[in-house]
């Protein structure tokens, strides 16, 4: 066998679907964790400066943000490790299915690992779908604030409300308790918040974090299809003495 044929045979064992999913997963997790971490820090500062004068009112928010920072560290570490494991499993199953190294060979342990990877990937897909929905919440809150600021800076002709009565109350979102003071920002104060670099940066970071979570969901969907297909073929070929290739 020549060098060219050997290279073609080796390239045939590359799990391109798993490789694409791994790159997409790493990118999505990096965007979600990195942008989410910085955005949460900016949220804490905005609340302390403009919505809560008493430190005891936002102490719970501070603790929650600190806890979410640690959760982000754990999610990033686990996702990167699991992505590498799935990529390695993809190389194993692709080589076995395509019989790269001779006739079809697999073990009960190998099929068990493939089945477990399918199960875990489905669970992670559902979990990340929830994370994607959850990450859209702060982006929605920021969009409401931005829309209110746009109304203040460029009021429509048919506006009947006084500019100073246009407010955003973060207490209704559960960010701080109802007895927090002032708890809301109105008129010129709200415009000042929207013009700060913290608001602009955190708004865009939350959008990017949401997009990163969406990319991770897509990556896990690709993983689901690849691992399910590989597991089905392994199970089929281990039971039947056939030469059919899908």
Swiss-Prot record:
Its main location: membrane. One of its GO terms (biological process) is central nervous system myelination. Pfam families: Myelin_PLP (PF01275). One of its GO terms (cellular component) is plasma membrane. InterPro entries: Myelin_PLP (IPR001614), Myelin_PLP_CS (IPR018237). The chain crosses the membrane at residues 19-35, 71-87, 118-134, 206-222. It is a multi-pass membrane protein. Keywords: Membrane, Transmembrane, Transmembrane helix. GO terms for molecular function: structural constituent of myelin sheath. It is found in: Membrane. Highly expressed in white matter in myelinating shark brain. The keyword 4Fe-4S does not apply. The keyword Membrane applies. PANTHER family: MYELIN PROTEOLIPID, NEURONAL MEMBRANE GLYCOPROTEIN M6-B. Belongs to the myelin proteolipid protein family. This is Proteolipid protein DM gamma.
């Amino acid at each position: 066998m020549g060098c060219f044929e050997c290279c073609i045979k080796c390239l045939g064992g590359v799990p391109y679907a798993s490789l694409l999913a791994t790159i997409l997963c790493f990118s999505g997790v990096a965007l979600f964790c990195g942008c989410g971490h910085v955005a949460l820090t900016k949220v804490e500062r905005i609340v302390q400066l403009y919505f809560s004068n008493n430190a005891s009112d936002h102490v719970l928010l501070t603790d929650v943000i600190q806890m979410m920072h640690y959760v982000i560290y754990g999610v990033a570490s686990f996702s990167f490790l699991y992505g590498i494991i799935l990529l390695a499993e993809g190389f194993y199953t692709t080589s076995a299915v395509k019989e790269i190294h001779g006739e079809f060979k697999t073990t009960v342990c190998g099929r068990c690992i493939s089945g477990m990877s399918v199960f875990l990937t489905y669970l992670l897909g559902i979990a990340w779908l929830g994370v994607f929905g959850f990450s859209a919440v702060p982006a929605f809150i920021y969009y409401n604030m931005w829309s209110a600021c746009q109304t203040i800076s460029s009021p429509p002709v048919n506006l009947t409300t006084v500019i100073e009565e246009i407010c955003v109350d973060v207490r209704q979102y559960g960010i701080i308790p109802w007895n927090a003071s002032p708890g809301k920002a109105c008129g010129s104060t709200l415009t000042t918040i929207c013009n700060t670099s913290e608001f602009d940066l955190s708004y865009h970071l939350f959008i990017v974090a949401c997009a990163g979570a969406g990319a991770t969901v897509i990556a896990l969907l690709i993983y689901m299809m690849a691992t399910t297909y590989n597991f089905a073929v392994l199970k089929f070929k281990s039971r039947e003495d056939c030469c059919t290739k899908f």
